[in-house]
Amino acid sequence: MKDLQFPVGISNFEKIREGGYYYIDKTNLISELLSGGIAEVTLITRPRRFGKSLGMSTLANFLDIRKDSKQMFEGLAISKNTELCKKWMNQCPVVFFSFKDTDGLTFESAYGMLCMKLAFAFQDYQFLLDDDAISDDDKGIFKRILGRTASMDETKSCFLLLTRMLEIHFKKSAVVILDEYDVPIAKASSNGYYSQMLDVMRAMMSTTLKDNISLDFAVVTGCLKIAKESIFTGTNNFVSDTILSPRLSESFGFTQADVDQMLKDAGLESQSAEIKAWYDGYHFGDADIYCPWDVISYLRDFQYGVAQKPKSYWKNTSDNAIIRSFIDYAGDNITTKLETLMAGGSIVQHIEENLTYDYLHSSEENLWSVLYLTGYLTKVRDKDLADSLPDGCSALMIPNAEIREIFETTVSKWFDDSAKAWNRSPLFDAVWSGNSEALTKEMTKLLRMTISYHDYREDFYHAFLAGIFTGAGYVVESNKEHGEGRSDVIVKDIRNGRVAIFEAKYSKTLDALPDACDAAIQQINDRMYAADFRDDYDDILCYGIAFFKKRCMVRKK
């Protein structure tokens, strides 16, 4: 493998270019945004880890009047558009601010973090304090923001102030670039101070974007398009580019051509199929897209010998709480759809693009929309659809192996947590009393409460069996060597000197359950699973269990 510097976790365009990091050219984003009629406000939404921050850093470096960016962009696609470069490169005062990490368990701590981030950002503009054309009143507010003593009203109007001061100084209206605008609202929704943070963000957006005579245009990014009436009230000439939009569809994330080039440059063409299975599968507008964070993380790890096989990088960047809350909300209808998705199928749903964080969990439709818009699901391509869809509906699927693993891990954890809360005493009593009929009844009852994955293969039932005994004071072993073979699940009640041995079989039909049960018992006998326990346990109970979807049959040896 060739030694390349992959910019994992680096979203600063200038640092990537000057530091010699590997870069996939996405500067056509600039052409797309600046060609033709420019919207006063453009909102771009993409899932996390798809390059939004790097895209905004690229745009800011291109426009910033205080920089000389010609060398930074030399050799890139945008440099070939000489007319556009002459008109726009380093011609605009720029306000570039990211709301990333604006978080806190309380409103006070989150607001304090916001004020600190604003103070750091304003340090880059202290040259404005030396301009005699700017009023002392404006300079006073600027200094209070810098010193974190500004009133809340002054904080809400901070970008209005900054654009006005920049216009006075440069005699040009300013471009405002706001990255991850919805992070403070999302965190507030999770931590119980939604209305307070919404009030701050709505006022900040309104003062910056509405009737601001010092604003040339603005670009705002986030994960979700919050309903206009919630946060962008009164904003005129407002354009949104979501994952449904064809424009900018290749500007965030890697195309197949991008990945092919990366693998060629790295000398890793042999990894193409695995990378595609794990990190491809997103369909944005008209484009098929890979998650860029995953691809460069995998290539970096492969380069340094950290990982030779693909793994989930997404799950390490968030707690994936949206899936868990979705499962907790699940009724029978949602459960059936989740099982279809996790078995590799697709479901048809209406997608609501205009959401508010306080109503994300208010309906099944909203929950499916959030899973789609945040990248946990993707659209089935039109050419792959067997039938036409109702207006406003999309066929949704899990995009790749990485996201499927996240779903499976979350479902497994949900089952383990849920099982501890269920009344399992009747099931345990049936196990230790040798009552196979009662055990059949209790097992079936619990099966109907689960969300299956692996398309009802035996590994699902192994996980189910082990999970219902976990956290109940027993020692649970799964697929350890015993006797002359491998028993599926062993449950040891050491205090009472007893052990239960379970062998599970999957039946292809409901009618075949008895035969599958008999086969499980026969295997216990033939492979002598009980032999290892005769010296240490007084009671050894052996059960053959046969499963068919969410039905089971238990027989005792």
Annotate each language-model stretch with its function.
Residues 1-66, 70-81, 446:
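Walker A/P-loop-proximal flanking segment of P-loop NTPase domains
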Residues 170-194:
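Conserved P-loop NTPase "ATPase switch" module shared by AAA+ and STAND
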Residues 183, 193-234:
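Sensor-1/coupling segment of RecA-like P-loop NTPase cores
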Residues 228-233, 241-300:
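Amphipathic alpha-helical segments of the small helical/lid subdomains adjacent to P-loop NTPase cores
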Residues 238, 290-528, 539, 553-557:
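Extended alpha-helical interface modules used as scaffolds for assembling large macromolecular complexes
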